[in-house]
């Protein structure tokens, strides 16, 4: 199969993965309107083409939380990453490390912190939820610090799990789920050999280390359902801010006032995100939410964005809308499921190439030069900055 874009990896991953795994990462909440709008709104952003600008010295390098990045991207935290390729977190982290960008390990990863951190040179980032079990949170933070993790990504848009209808149909949940998953596994031999047999253990590594016993998929579903805490507030984050002495990023911001609260709280960064459309259907896409948030806090806090990014052109669009950098989620997971570490490495190379083309043709020699001026702002560009801002205000 010819791979020339992230969409090719998605098609390949759908053939390789058991349906319960493919649809778990591919799907969203409820009727998936926000999931679709994430991609559509971003693709509708019109860039301003410029010519004869002497683009021979173009650079994608940037600095984020005092870390030098080869390009303004990081790999987002993705739960169960190790179920998509053999020891998937290790492979994805290696590809990011080789490229010179950060990898973010999820709380609910298959590979534990201690397995992933020693395999890379660059300090990885660690993602954590606010959970009822504060003992687990403290244990995870202590282990992340001991492993040299540099940045804490705190996910705050999951006080309760989202309603993901696809999961019941695919076998991730619903009647006879375990039997359905088993049948899917044995009928997808490439995955069964690579991950099912040779990717063991299939524990939730960070949780197993804390509980002192193996944890499987059923434990994952049950543990998360019982531990998300709908009572959380900014006050619950204060002890974490005191405990964690590195950069702290709040992930799951869609409203300018919440962004201002993050600044007042003392966070180092925010991620404009709707959890990839996996939590509440009907909320704004990240592309629509981003301009107003950038107006509110740009310069006061580092702004990252995710949800809907599928290529290097989308990265440039997000930066033009106000982000300093982006997180890649689904796009890299499709590549990981298809060709492991090499797939992720190839995807990152594709994104780099696509960014260079977009920057060359918009006249931006550096990441700093990508701005609102890179967008078409007239009546015909219905989904550019002004239109996005109006939609957000409405």
UniProtKB/Swiss-Prot annotation:
UniProt-annotated binding residues for FMN: 106, 127, 155, 251, 306-330
Major enzyme class: oxidoreductase
Superkingdom of source: Bacteria
Keyword Glycosyltransferase found: no
Pfam families with a match to the protein in the record: FMN_dh
Subcellular location: Cell inner membrane
KW Cell membrane (keyword) present: yes
UniProt keywords, alphabetically: Cell inner membrane, Cell membrane, Flavoprotein, FMN, Membrane, Oxidoreductase
Reaction(s) catalysed by this chain's protein: (S)-lactate + A = pyruvate + AH2
Active site: 275
EC id: 1.1.-.-
Amino-acid positions noted as binding substrate in the UniProt annotation, renumbered to this chain: 24, 129, 164, 278
Cofactor(s) needed by this chain: FMN
GO biological process, one term: lactate metabolic process
Topology within the bilayer: Peripheral membrane protein
Function: Catalyzes the conversion of L-lactate to pyruvate. Is coupled to the respiratory chain.
Family of this protein: Belongs to the FMN-dependent alpha-hydroxy acid dehydrogenase family.
HAMAP family on file: L_lact_dehydr
Full protein name: L-lactate dehydrogenase
Lineage, uppermost ranks: Bacteria, Pseudomonadati, Pseudomonadota, Gammaproteobacteria, Enterobacterales
